[in-house]
Regions:
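A local structural motif
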Residues: 23-24, 48-73
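Periplasmic-binding protein-like
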Residues: 37-44, 141-161
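Short helices/loops that flank or line small-molecule/ion binding pockets
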Residues: 41-42, 61-90, 95
């Protein structure tokens, strides 16, 4: 089971909802491969793109846009600084926080931790001599105390429990 997630959010300094995407608008999107696929999955949940079926790469060149807009690929940490250049931008919560944005109050949409392959997990090799200790650590990481710690340390939602 997951431990925590730094969720993606869809942000805008120009619009109050995704329904306001203008014809020919722009969406800033993370340029790195794994986070771009996550960003596109989030946009798909909002009816802006359709993800191709199968196990192929998911990127801005493989999705079907369901509205008339363009993507601009940007290095993740730069997205929050250049937010005024786009109608919307999909930004990692930790980058948003570093740029003075709160994922819980400023994002129009936030990525869910439920069944999310991007959640942080504890992994170990079967048969490890420390399996008992690691199992105890896993139990502790999924405790109410850890959940409370995450929620209190990142009240803006830039890190959320995934259990």
């Amino acid at each position: 089971a997951g431990i925590h997630l730094e969720p993606l959010g869809i942000f805008s300094n120009k619009h109050q909802s995704l329904d306001e995407l203008p014809d020919g608008g722009t969406i800033g999107i993370i340029s790195d491969t794994s986070n771009q696929a996550r960003a596109l999955e989030l946009l798909a949940t909002q009816g802006l793109v359709e993800i191709p079926e199968g196990d192929g790469d998911v990127n801005i060149n493989t999705v079907t846009k369901l509205k008339n807009f363009t993507f601009t690929e940007v290095d993740g940490p730069q997205l929050v600084r250049s937010l005024d250049d786009y109608d919307y931008a999909v930004i990692n919560g930790n980058f948003a926080q570093e740029g003075g944005k709160s994922i819980s109050s400023d994002a129009l949409v936030v990525e869910s931790p439920v069944d999310n392959p991007a959640v942080n997990v504890l992994v170990w090799k079967n048969g490890s001599a420390k399996a008992e200790t690691i199992a105890k650590l896993e139990q502790l990481l999924h405790s109410d105390e850890v959940k409370q710690y995450i929620e209190q340390t990142w009240p803006d939602g830039s890190v959320i429990p995934a259990f």
